[in-house]
UniProtKB/Swiss-Prot annotation:
It is a single-pass type I membrane protein. The lineage of its organism: Eukaryota, Metazoa, Chordata, Craniata, Vertebrata. Residues 638-667 form the EGF-like domain. This is Disintegrin and metalloproteinase domain-containing protein 21. GO terms for biological process: proteolysis. May be involved in sperm maturation and/or fertilization. May also be involved in epithelia functions associated with establishing and maintaining gradients of ions or nutrients. Residues 212-402 form the Peptidase M12B domain. The gene is Adam21. Its EC number is 3.4.24.-. A tripeptide motif (VGE) within disintegrin-like domain could be involved in the binding to egg integrin receptor and thus could mediate sperm/egg binding. The cysteine-rich domain encodes putative cell-fusion peptides, which could be involved in sperm-egg fusion. It comes from the Eukaryota. PANTHER family: ADAM A DISINTEGRIN AND METALLOPROTEASE DOMAIN (PTHR11905), DISINTEGRIN AND METALLOPROTEINASE DOMAIN-CONTAINING PROTEIN 21 (PTHR11905:SF116). Residues 1-39 form the signal peptide. PROSITE patterns: ADAM_MEPRO, DISINTEGRIN_1, DISINTEGRIN_2, EGF_2, EGF_3, ZINC_PROTEASE.
Length: 729
């Protein structure tokens, strides 16, 4: 039995579904974009070396422009670009969370002079949006109906880059579905139709302003943060890269998109991520309170959730109408330019744009508000009309020019968040009265050194070497306090690819293998099935055996990848472990019973039966993204020899030394740890030192004592004694 997601009570025919979609599209509503598979490329990437050339940019001073020559697709292309203005503040406010889930704001330096926009020489209406912040060119280039992504090759000594051609074939993507109920219609206090009636009375030619300025706040969920290897700097870079592309798409609308703040949920999701409609509603309420310190015209949340089967959702015409000025975008791990399309699309709904109809045209094969998600760069005439109707009627918040560095409001103390120039923040008056470490004015009390953190106890820094984060498994590493900070060092773990368990390898802090996954699903005693089970089932391409999906159908595994698709088990005694909506299948393969779980597309829950990344699939090979790849794809910047074989490499490619050896390379005697873990325990050092002195002394004393007692109590004879015979008397 196959699985179907039904629309309506019967949903018997495709025509009925089609009519329903057309009806939904004609109404103001919440709009969502259905999920697609991973990015499809027309061909393998080409290696190019951008050559800097003398600028011939049209109508501008050469000092303002950079020009590069790139050869790909059999042709030479000259790109002209210049630095963007108003894209991001130099010190953009970034809000994160401590391990106690206390909000913590920072103003890290984010370069604002390395994001570019421009055009391709000789290509009318071309689009270029590049970042050059990391020593190479990364971004999107669109021209002549094709979209290309470019990214630098890491550690290349010759400035090599990869150029990918994105597939513009819209038939690969299912149409967007509009989730509409009468209840959701009533939720919007002021609908698009009323905006239209009011705007139609206006004369657009007279009222069209010179420019619009959208101040955008972006929240990043834990899944998106994890996708960036839990690297805060990478998250910031990814967000700005996407906003740079979105800003370029909105330039024809005379609209600047400025990033005014980022919040990163680096300690777990604040809201449940199971239903995108609920996420949008919860986010709209949450941001009214928790994001109120960030001045913004719109707030969107970037998520990565396998529990959600759509790409995005937003309130129509929510701009300048809090709390409806928000949206959700679900990143699926594909090209950044496609994700930027999703963000631009959902922002379009925020601006009042609906999905394009057949009569709409943008002069390109892909339009931003198309009912199919394809690489796009332009808005249609319909989108322009919707944009004008909404912004001229309610877009007053878009008139003001962004204030550099003014993302957060002035008032900070008392909101429970430790921000710049604050020593602590105990919150309300009542909370501060109970706080032994912090005053109401956000300063520390006398004799208090800290008020929060894993290395703060009783308002004091914990001693140097105190354990603040213990090791939880063989692929994890411990951390210790340094005695001068309230924060525990960043959570570190064993470098990906280091052997663990029985023939397995550490990956992302876990030691995964097929046997363990079988036990997790079917209980104690279950183990991975024979190779025949994997070969027979995972080549079928159904819910019981596959190597991923393209968004609509299950994909058959290649023979080389069969151990990276679905996990198959044997020796199953407890068949009640899997919970709904999973179904079980058992088949016989060469006399062996193979058990596996079936998963239905569109159910909104992860597939527990998919083989986990990092699982061994052959000698020197692991599973990554449903592919069996060589361990060599992982970074080997640190080797056992690097650590003198007296330690293990960590996720930052530094040595974490065994006890008895000291970092950085475990060459000299010491107390273990790494340059990232904090100094190891002082107590342990003292104990070991004392024991090293006292144990030998005690051993000698005990030996002497035993010898003395033995002589006293055993009375060892010294030789025969003479006795005199007595004479008879």
């Amino acid at each position: 039995m196959e699985c179907f997601i039904m629309l309506g009570a019967d949903a018997r025919t495709l025509m009925r579904v089609t009519l329903l979609l057309l009806w939904l599209k004609a109404l103001p509503s919440l709009i969502d974009l259905s999920q697609t598979g991973s990015t499809q490329y027309l061909s393998s990437p080409e290696v190019v070396i951008p050559l800097k050339v003398t600028s011939r940019a049209r109508g501008a001073k050469n000092s303002e422009w950079l020009s590069y020559s790139l050869v790909f697709g059999g042709r030479r292309h000259v790109v002209h670009m210049r630095v963007k203005k108003l894209l991001v503040s130099t010190h953009i406010p970034v809000l994160t969370y401590t391990e106690e889930h206390t909000p913590l704001s920072d103003y890290p330096f984010v370069p604002s002079d390395c994001y570019y926009h421009g055009y391709v020489e000789g290509a009318l209406e071309s689009l270029v949006a590049f970042s050059a912040c990391n020593g190479g060119l990364q971004g999107v280039l669109q021209m002549n109906g094709f979209s290309y992504e470019i990214e630098p090759i890491k550690h290349s000594s010759t400035f090599e880059h990869l150029v990918y051609t994105l597939n513009n074939n819209k038939t690969q993507f299912p149409p967007m579905l509009c989730s509409l109920t009468e209840k959701r219609l009533l939720y919007q206090p002021f609908g698009v139709e009323e905006a239209k009636k009011s705007a139609m009375k206006q004369n657009y030619g007279k009222l069209w302003p010179h420019m619009w300025f959208l101040e955008l706040a972006v929240v990043v969920d834990y899944g998106f943060f994890t996708n960036a290897q839990q690297n805060l700097s990478k998250v910031r870079g990814d967000v700005v890269l996407v906003v740079n592309m979105v800003d370029s798409m909105y330039k024809p609308l005379d609209t600047y998109v400025t990033l005014v703040g980022i919040e990163i949920w680096n300690r777990g999701n604040v809201l449940p991520m199971e239903n995108i409609h609920q996420v949008l509603e919860d986010f709209s309420h949450w941001k009214q309170i928790s994001l109120s310190q960030v001045h913004h015209d719109a707030a969107h949340i970037f998520i990565r959730s396998s529990l959600i089967s759509v790409l995005g959702i937003a309130y129509i015409a929510g701009i300048c109408r809090p709390p409806l000025d928000c949206g959700v975008e679900n990143f699926q791990g594909d090209a950044w330019s496609l994700f930027a399309n999703t963000v631009a699309h959902e922002l379009g709904h925020t601006f009042g744009m609906k999905h394009d109809e057949e009569s709409c045209s943008c002069g390109k094969s892909g339009c931003v508000m198309s009912t199919f998600r394809v690489p796009a760069e332009r808005f249609t005439n319909c989108s322009y009309s919707d944009f004008m109707k909404t912004t001229l009627n309610q877009g007053t918040c878009l008139y003001n020019h962004p204030r550099p560095g003014a993302g957060f409001l002035v008032k900070r103390c008392g909101n429970g968040m430790v921000e710049s120039e604050e020593e602590c923040d105990c919150g309300s008056v009542q909370e501060c009265e109970q706080d032994p470490c912090c005053f109401l004015n956000c300063t520390l009390r006398p004799a208090a050194a800290c008020s929060f953190g894993l290395c703060c106890k009783d308002c004091k820094f914990m001693l140097l070497g105190e354990l603040c984060r213990p090791k939880i498994n063989e692929c994890d590493l411990p951390e210790w306090c340094n005695g001068t900070s309230h924060q525990c060092p960043e959570d570190g773990y064993v470098q990906d690819g280091v052997p663990c368990g029985a023939g397995a390898y550490c990956y992302q802090k876990q030691c995964n293998n097929h046997d363990q996954q079988c036990r997790e699903i079917f209980g104690k005693g279950a183990r991975s099935a024979s190779h025949n089970c994997y070969k027979e089932i995972n080549l079928q391409g159904n819910r019981f055996g596959h190597c991923g999906t393209d968004g609509t159908v299950f994909l058959k595994c290649r023979m080389s990848d069969v151990f990276c698709g679905k996990v198959h088990c044997e020796n199953v005694e407890d068949i009640h472990h899997p919970q709904a909506p999973y179904v079980l299948q058992n088949i016989y393969a060469n006399g062996i019973t193979c058990w596996s779980t079936g998963h239905c597309l569109g159910m909104g829950v992860p597939d527990v039966g998919e083989v986990k990344d990092g699982t061994t699939c052959g000698v020197g090979k692991i599973c990554l993204h449903k592919k069996c790849v060589s361990l060599s794809v992982l970074s080997n910047a640190c080797l056992p020899e690097t650590c003198n074989r007296k330690g293990v490499c960590n996720n930052k490619h530094h040595c974490h030394c065994d006890y008895g050896w000291s970092p950085p390379f475990c060459l000299h005697r010491g107390y273990g740890g790494s340059i990232d873990s904090g100094p190891t325990s002082q107590k342990r050092r003292v104990i070991i030192t004392v024991l090293s002195i006292t144990v030998p002394v005690l051993s000698i004393l005990i030996c002497l004592l035993i010898a003395g007692l033995y002589r006293i109590y055993c009375k060892i004879p010294s030789g025969p004694k003479e006795t005199k015979a007595s004479s008879p008397g």
